[in-house]
Amino acid sequence: MRFIFPTIAVLLEASMIVLFGFFVKYETEQNAIQQPNSTNSTKVDRSLELYPLFQDVHVMIFVGFGFLMTFLKKYGFSSVGINLLIAALGLQWGTFVQGMVHRHGQTIYIGIKNMINADFSTATVLISFGAVLGKISPTQMLIMTIIEITVFAGNEYVVGEIFQASDIGASMTIHAFGAYFGLAVAGVLYRTGLRKGHEKEESEYHSDLFAMIGTLFLWMFWPSFNSAIAETAEEQYLAIINTYLSLVACVLTAYAMSSLVGHRGKLDMVHIQNATLAGGVAVGTCADMKIHPYGSLIIGSIAGMVSVLGFRFLTPCLTAKLRIHDTCGVHNLHGLPGVVGGLSSIVAILLGVSTASSMTMQAAALGSSIGSAIAGGLITGLILRFIVRGQPSKDNFFDDSVYWEVPKEKELDNV
C-alpha cells in the first residue's frame, strides 16, 4: 500500500496530464476556428445553461453515491473516500476516452456537456464499486476504473451510434451495464466463507442514517440525471416529469413490499435506502418518450416491487448458488430496474408512443449492455485477481483500518 498505491496514482495522473496536453482544448477554441469573425459569447451562454444540471449530477456522483454506501458500520471512510478517489480519476479518463471515441481520435473540445457525460461514465464505476465494496483495494479500484470506463465508452458508442437506440436516462448503458460489470468482478474475486456472511458486514443505527442521506440526495436530483443530455426542451420536460412520477410511485410500492416480506410486517432500511430509487433507474430509457403520466407511475411501481423482491430473495440466492457476493445489492437497485427500463422502452415502441428507435434495436442495446458488461467484468476480475492483486484478506474485509488511520474506540467514546 505504501509504495504501490502512490506510484500507480501518480502515474495515472501524469498520464492524464500528458493526454490532455496533446488532445484536449477548450470548447471556445473550436468555436473560434469554425466562426472566426463571430463572438463566442452566445455559444458559451448556451453551454452554461447546462451548468445547473451538471451540478445536480455532480452532487449525485460525490454525495449521493458516496453516502449511500456508508451503511457498513466499519467501512464509512472507504465508502465516501474511495468514492471520491475513483470519481476524480473517472471524470478525467471518461472525458478523454469518450472524446476519442466520438471524435474518432481528433482533438477533444471540452465543454459542460462533456463534463456531464464524464459524470455518467463515472457513475458506471461507482455502481460496480457497490458490488465489490469492502472486498477490494484502492489500487485495484483505480485499475478497474480505467478498464470499465473504456469498455463502457465502447458499448455506449455501439448502442448510440450503431444501433441508434434510445436511452436518454441510461437505464441500459449505465445502470444495467454497471451492475452486471460489478457482479462479474465480484464473482471472480469471491472468497469462500462469504456465503454465511461476514462479522463486519453489518450496519448500525447511525451508519444506516448516513446511507439514507445519500438516498435522499439521489432521489431529489434523479430528474436532472435523466434529463441532462436531452436534445430539445420538450424531451427535457418529458424526462423530468416522467422521472418524478416514477420515483414517487416507486416509493409507495417499495414501502408496501418491504412491509409485506419483512419480519412481522416491519420495514427494512436496506429496502428503503435502495428500492425507493429504482423508479428513477427503470424509467430512464423511455424518460423522454410520451408514455403518459400513468405509464410513468406503472414503471415506477413495478421497479419498486422488483427491487425489494430482489433484495429479499435473489441476493441470498446469488451468494449461495452462484458465489456472487453483492455487498450493496446493486443488482436490485441498478441491474433489475435497468432491465425493466430496457423492456419498458420496447413496450413503449410497440404501443406506438415513440418512433425514436425500433424494438429490435432497443433489444439489441439491452443485450449489448449486459453482454459487454459481463465479458468486461470477468476479464477485469481476472486481471485484478492474478495480475494487480492486493485484495485484502477475508478477515480484513469491510474494515477501514486496513487502509485508513481510524480513531480508536476509546477516542470515539470520549468525543
Swiss-Prot record:
Name the UniProt record assigns to this protein? Ammonium transporter Rh type A
Keywords in alphabetical order, please. Answer: Ammonia transport, Glycoprotein, Membrane, Transmembrane, Transmembrane helix, Transport
Task: Kindly indicate whether the keyword Transmembrane belongs to this entry.
Answer: yes
**Has the keyword Transmembrane helix been applied to this entry?**
yes
Reactions catalysed: methylamine(out) = methylamine(in); NH4(+)(in) = NH4(+)(out); CO2(out) = CO2(in)
Membrane topology term reads: Multi-pass membrane protein
Q: Please give the subunit comment from the record.
A: Homodimer. Heterotrimer; a RHCE monomer interacts with a RHAG homodimer. Component of the ankyrin-1 complex in the erythrocyte, composed of ANK1, RHCE, RHAG, SLC4A1, EPB42, GYPA, GYPB and AQP1. Interacts with GYPB (via the N-terminal); this interaction bridges the (RHAG)2(RHCE) heterotrimer with the SLC4A1 Band 3 I dimer complexed with GYPA.
| Extracellular-facing ranges | 24-51, 98-115, 164-167, 230-236, 288-290, 354-363
Q: Which residues lie on this side of the membrane: Cytoplasmic?
A: 1-2, 73-76, 137-142, 189-208, 258-268, 312-332, 385-415
Write out the function statement from the record: Component of the ankyrin-1 complex, a multiprotein complex involved in the stability and shape of the erythrocyte membrane. Heterotrimer with RHCE (RHAG)2(RHCE), that transports ammonium and its related derivative methylammonium, in both neutral and ionic forms, across the erythrocyte membrane. The transport of NH4(+) is electrogenic and masks the NH3 transport. Also, may act as a CO2 channel. Moreover in erythrocyte, regulates RHD membrane expression and is associated with rhesus blood group antigen expression.
Transmembrane intervals: 3-23, 52-72, 77-97, 116-136, 143-163, 168-188, 209-229, 237-257, 269-287, 291-311, 333-353, 364-384
Native source organism of the sequence: Canis lupus familiaris (Dog)
Enumerate the glycosylated residues. Answer: 37, 40
List the Gene3D superfamilies hit by this protein, alphabetically: Ammonium transporter AmtB like domains
Q: How is it modified after translation?
A: Glycosylated.
